[in-house]
Amino acid sequence: MIGWRYLTGAFFFLLVGAIAKPISAQTYQGRELVKAQLIADTDAIAAGKTFTAGLLLRMAPHWHTYWKFSGDAGLPSEIKWTLPSGWKAGEIQWPIPLRLKDPGDIETYGYENEVLLMQQITPPASLADSSFTLSADASWLVCERLCIPGSAKLQLELPIAVQTGPANEIRGRR
């Protein structure tokens, strides 16, 4: 049932992604190819409490990015976090990819439409500020008939609190 657990987590992040801003867009010849955005599964950061953050990439129709093992061609997307001392980022949790055919019958593995690359983030045991800005440099290779490298410097500001809740919790619901 790991598939359902992953899909449930991905759905949760997609709901959160509708709220999170800002979004960075990659354009080529006036056409928007990829929208990149950082999202998190929490409404606040608590000292020492691990949470999940992710890079959401939304590709234009017929364009794709690559999995960590891309196959005969391609490069995987990367996330380089800028975290202060004491913060830790886990490994990227790669969703199961699609098998794709690139021009020349080259077999690759990747993602069409959108992909969420999640990572566990652990803050230190004590936090002094009232908020924290997660910063990441993201890079990817997006392809259709040709491949174009893309990148973005992304940020997501979250408050620091003693207690946290899910980012998509509906408040005041009866």
Please state what every model-predicted region is.
Residues M1-W4:
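N-terminal secretory signal peptides that target proteins for export/translocation
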Residues T8-A18:
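Bacterial N-terminal signal peptides
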Residues P22-R174:
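Extracellular/lumen-exposed scaffold segments
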